[in-house]
Amino acid sequence: MSAIFNFCAGPAMLPPAVMQKAQKELLNWNGLGISVMEISHRSKEFIALTEQAEADLRALMEIPSNYHVLFMHGGGRGQFSAVVNNFLGNDGRALYLVDGSWSKAAAEEAEKLVGKANIDSIELVSAVNCLNRVTLPDLSKIDKDYRYVHYCPNETVDGIEIFDDINSPWPVIADMSSNILSRKIDVSQFGLIYAGAQKNIGPSGLSIVIVRDDMLALPSLPQSSIMDYRLAVENDSMYNTPPTFAWYLAAEVFAWLKCVGGVTEMEKLNIEKARRLYECIDELDFYVSGVAKENRSRMNITFQLTNSQLDSQFLAEAQAAGLVALKGHRSVGGMRASLYNAMPLAGVDALVGFMRAFAAKNA
């Protein structure tokens, strides 16, 4: 069978080496004669797995000792409400920086929970010469008191990524669901980082939360116990039964990432993958990117065909060539190629080759 390259925005492809290992030990994990899906989450074998997973993630991201690492339910949307309920209390206010669909959704969820009067938002994206460009505000000039500032550094729908740090007098909370582990960051610049697993970590159903000690002292609102960060810390992410198979696969992805050189080497590869695809888009008049170069996402590359009537043909022929899940989000249309960590350079080269051939044939 010819190679299939999966460009889905999420759930996304997992490293083949991880999938093959999971397949091999599915019915007999760790020599126990049963699957990792079947053992108690409180068994010494599974506890050892969770401890290694946390240690590997801490090493990969250089997480300081004053941060807790939590493995939780709910994905990114679950964290939209968890952040509000854990930190705003009865009188807290928060600022949301909106650079695309997911940061907008987070702000709307916050407004629903505590009212618009307690949530401020700033739109970061404007169209300049038909290109979407991000302008970061000077937060030091805002004469208000916020519990936190929330933003999403990579917007999967819009193909926008913010590479600059957010300089804020208030704790910064980041939704890194789609670019965690794709490039080096300074974790100490954040009060909290959260990420749904289904893009760069593992399958859906799991979310990672990295929270600084002092954030847990902020007043909270009544909420579901399974989304309470303090309870999660006190119970080592096992207040209730966790998504064990997703946790196991996340542990395997972390181990794989360490084996291939860690985040430093992965960032180099991601830069090269994105460079090759954007170079193709820019060279050919057949395709167009709607994002300014300094804000183009490395993870989710959005583009349009100049003749949109060819969209269906492009997708059908790409699928036949083993290049799947290239259709853009329904809200924006066009195409989207998601180049998460597991996507090999060969997949990008195959896509670029197809795009050049398709353009030549249909120009």
Swiss-Prot record:
Q: Which GO terms describe its cellular component?
A: cytoplasm
Q: What is this enzyme's class at the first EC digit?
A: transferase
Q: Name one GO biological process term.
A: L-serine biosynthetic process
What SUPFAM superfamilies does this protein map onto?
A: PLP-dependent transferases (SSF53383)
Please list the cofactors this protein needs: pyridoxal 5'-phosphate
| Annotated positions of the N6-(pyridoxal phosphate)lysine modification | K199
Where's it mainly located?
cytoplasm
Q: What is the top-level taxon of the source organism?
A: Bacteria
Q: Which reaction does it catalyse?
A: O-phospho-L-serine + 2-oxoglutarate = 3-phosphooxypyruvate + L-glutamate; 4-(phosphooxy)-L-threonine + 2-oxoglutarate = (R)-3-hydroxy-2-oxo-4-phosphooxybutanoate + L-glutamate
* Keyword vocabulary terms for this entry: Amino-acid biosynthesis, Aminotransferase, Cytoplasm, Pyridoxal phosphate, Pyridoxine biosynthesis, Serine biosynthesis, Transferase
Q: Does the keyword Hydrolase apply?
A: no
Chain sites annotated for binding L-glutamate: R42
Where is the protein found, in the record's own terms?
Answer: Cytoplasm
Which note does the record give on the cofactor?
Binds 1 pyridoxal phosphate per subunit.
Report residues binding pyridoxal 5'-phosphate. G76, R77, W102, T156, D175, Q198, N240, T241
Ribosomal protein: is it a keyword of this entry? Answer: no
According to the UniProt entry, where is the signal peptide? none
Query: What Enzyme Commission number does this protein have?
Result: 2.6.1.52
| Pfam families to which the protein is assigned, alphabetical | Aminotran_5 (PF00266)
Task: Please give the pathway this protein is involved in.
Answer: Amino-acid biosynthesis; L-serine biosynthesis; L-serine from 3-phospho-D-glycerate: step 2/3; Cofactor biosynthesis; pyridoxine 5'-phosphate biosynthesis; pyridoxine 5'-phosphate from D-erythrose 4-phosphate: step 3/5
MF GO annotations = O-phospho-L-serine:2-oxoglutarate aminotransferase activity; pyridoxal phosphate binding
Q: Which family does it belong to?
A: Belongs to the class-V pyridoxal-phosphate-dependent aminotransferase family. SerC subfamily.
* Subunit structure comment from the entry: Homodimer.
The free-text function statement in the UniProt record for this protein reads: Catalyzes the reversible conversion of 3-phosphohydroxypyruvate to phosphoserine and of 3-hydroxy-2-oxo-4-phosphonooxybutanoate to phosphohydroxythreonine.
Entry protein name: Phosphoserine aminotransferase
Organism equals: Shewanella pealeana (strain ATCC 700345 / ANG-SQ1)
